[in-house]
From Swiss-Prot:
PANTHER family: BLR3025 PROTEIN-RELATED (PTHR35369), CELL DIVISION INHIBITOR SULA (PTHR35369:SF4). The keyword Cell division applies. Belongs to the SulA family. The record marks H168 as: Essential for degradation by Lon protease. It comes from Serratia proteamaculans (strain 568). Is rapidly cleaved and degraded by the Lon protease once DNA damage is repaired. This is Cell division inhibitor SulA. One of its GO terms (biological process) is SOS response. The lineage of its organism: Bacteria, Pseudomonadati, Pseudomonadota, Gammaproteobacteria, Enterobacterales. Interacts with FtsZ. InterPro entries: Cell_div_suppressor_SulA (IPR004596), P-loop_NTPase (IPR027417), SulA_CellDiv_inhibitor (IPR050356), SulA_enterobact (IPR047696).
Length: 168
């Protein structure tokens, strides 16, 4: 697992992102996507939902990027979960505005099969930017949102949890 600072990232805008996306989409449709997962401390299902996908994406030659605001990923948890520790990159201790920008840049590069970002509520413009970046980079982007950011006025939301034991 590699931990990177925001100021020492290896985001490079190369032709790889566009050419790789074009080569992998024979039907002319983009394959990238953005999805949001809302979780809380009492529902551990997100791990069971995400792990098989993350394990499969870990078999690609590309990296798995975790943009985490405060936590540091546990190397032991990564190993026990069957994730390729050598392909996991983590950026931590960045504010949410920088996280949106970092996620967009990472998705665009095509160097990451998946980018997980812990983000606050996004504007439609931010969502569109991330969706386009995921499509161009042929990558999956998961917007992770703690339940505390849910507005109760909008009714009940299905929620998922990432256990704090995933971090150390």
């Amino acid at each position: 697992m590699r931990t990177q600072s925001l100021y020492n990232t290896h985001f490079s805008h190369t032709s790889f992102a566009v050419s790789n996306a074009a080569e992998s989409t024979n039907d002319g449709k983009e394959n990238g996507l953005i999805s949001e997962l809302v979780y809380n401390e009492h529902q551990p299902a997100v791990v069971q939902l995400l792990l098989p996908l993350l394990q499969q994406l870990g078999m690609q030659s590309r990296w798995l990027l975790w943009l985490t605001p405060q936590q540091k990923l546990s190397k032991l948890w990564l190993q026990q979960s069957g994730l390729p520790v050598g392909k996991v990159v983590q950026l931590s201790q960045i504010n949410s505005l920088d996280t949106v920008e970092a996620m967009e840049k990472a998705l665009l590069t095509g160097n990451y099969s998946v980018v997980l970002g812990w983000l606050p509520d996004l504007t439609e413009e931010d969502r569109l930017k991330l969706r386009r970046a995921a499509e161009l980079g042929n990558a999956y982007g998961f917007i992770m949102r703690p339940q505390r950011d849910i507005n109760p006025v909008h009714g009940h939301c299905s929620t998922l949890k990432i256990h704090s034991s995933l971090y150390h």
